[in-house]
């Protein structure tokens, strides 16, 4: 989505003009989940925010779409493992008491295949050796990049991958840090249905 940096003295009107929208998200540049993340839909909401370090935040266009994540293992630019999931709700809905969960997509579905191609395109541009967590929105059939992290997913997703596919993304990420030549053995087989 369109986005801009936050700094002292920035007004709602400034953000509205730059993003060309009245609905936007304020979130930390370096964060996880929906911690310290705010959906702003009015000037009053923006003015009521109490952000002590504005330079650590950004504003981005609010997208009303379905949120997905693709978790991957890549070695020397080659994807060894990738799995797509739909979030039950966008992560910010957790603040409203909604339970956030991930629903694994059927690998053969058209959407899963489209997300896999998109993930390949993004990761090909990045290259290297990583565990990644890519988040995208899908709105009216379009895939919209939200963010990517060079780390395993949060929440209960590491155990989910371990239980369902026998892949421990946290362990793999740690091994990548310790041994630049480490190549995990990945069978990518479904072990258990939940």
Regions found by a protein language model. Name each.
Residues 1-65, 75-76, 102-117, 121:
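Active-site nucleotide/adenylate-binding loops and adjacent lid/helix of ATP-dependent enzymes
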Residues 25, 133, 145:
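Generic enzyme active-site microenvironment
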Residues 61-127, 138, 145, 149-177, ...:
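ATP-dependent carboxylate/phosphate-activation module, predominantly the ATP-grasp catalytic core
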Residues 183-194:
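A glycine-rich beta-turn/hairpin centered on an aromatic-Pro dipeptide
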Residues 54-55, 126-129:
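Short secondary-structure junctions
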Residues 19-21, 139-144:
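A short, glycine/Asx- and small/polar-enriched loop/turn
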Residues 35, 129-133:
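Short secondary-structure junction motifs
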Residues 58, 133-137:
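Cytosolic beta-strand hydrophobic patch enriched in CBS
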